[in-house]
Amino acid sequence: MESTEKQTWQRYLTDYNEGLGLVYERFVLNDFLLALKSRHGIQTVLEAPLFGMAGVSGINSVALAQAGCSVTLVDDHAGRLAAVERIWGELDLPARFVHHADWGQLPFPDDAFDLAWNWAALWYLSDPAALLRELVRVSRRVVFVAMPNRAQAGYLLRKYLLERDFVKYAEERWADIGRVRRVLEGAGL
């Protein structure tokens, strides 16, 4: 299970060439996050966990840091977190890095962040619903969770042709955004 995914994320901690698809996705994500910042007055950001879909781990909140937000990044893998801290150092951007493994109990008080968010990591967690409830608890304004569209051609290619083992280490039912929304609403969002 972990070996395939481990190889993928480790590669991008030193090879920043994500390919055109991921670069385009990052531009769209950055625009979306900056629009959220503007619309909701976001100044403090929590991204937990920092590992989600392919590409360079831990850089999803870079645009927010560049726009002056205080960013906190949480991950359960100490080696990955250290590498992400190095990457942020290369970018000369400040951030707070927290090693924490209990996604059902984040080490922050209620309403600690303007934005608590996650980029496609739910299906790697043993209890995704617990993390979603925690994101609601620690956010005072906005919770944003993105998951891949299971009907999108790239996803289907990955699942059935390019990386058939993917479903062995990813819990696909958490890519159902309706399911995610129901948990968030049940937590009071």
Features from the language model and the residues they span:
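N-terminal, positively charged/glycine-rich alpha-helical extensions of SAM-dependent methyltransferases
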Residues: 1-18
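Conserved alpha-helix/loop element of class I SAM-dependent methyltransferases that forms part
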Residues: 21-48, 59-63
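Class I SAM-dependent methyltransferase SAM/SAH-binding core
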Residues: 44-105
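A short acidic, Gly/Pro-enriched loop at the edge of an enzyme's catalytic core
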Residues: 104-115
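A short SAM/SAH-binding and catalytic strip from SAM-dependent methyltransferases
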Residues: 114-127
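A short glycine-rich, Lys/Arg-flanked "PGG" loop and its adjoining helix->strand segment in the class I
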Residues: 129-144
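Conserved class I S-adenosyl-L-methionine
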Residues: 141-174
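Short alpha-helix
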Residues: 169-189
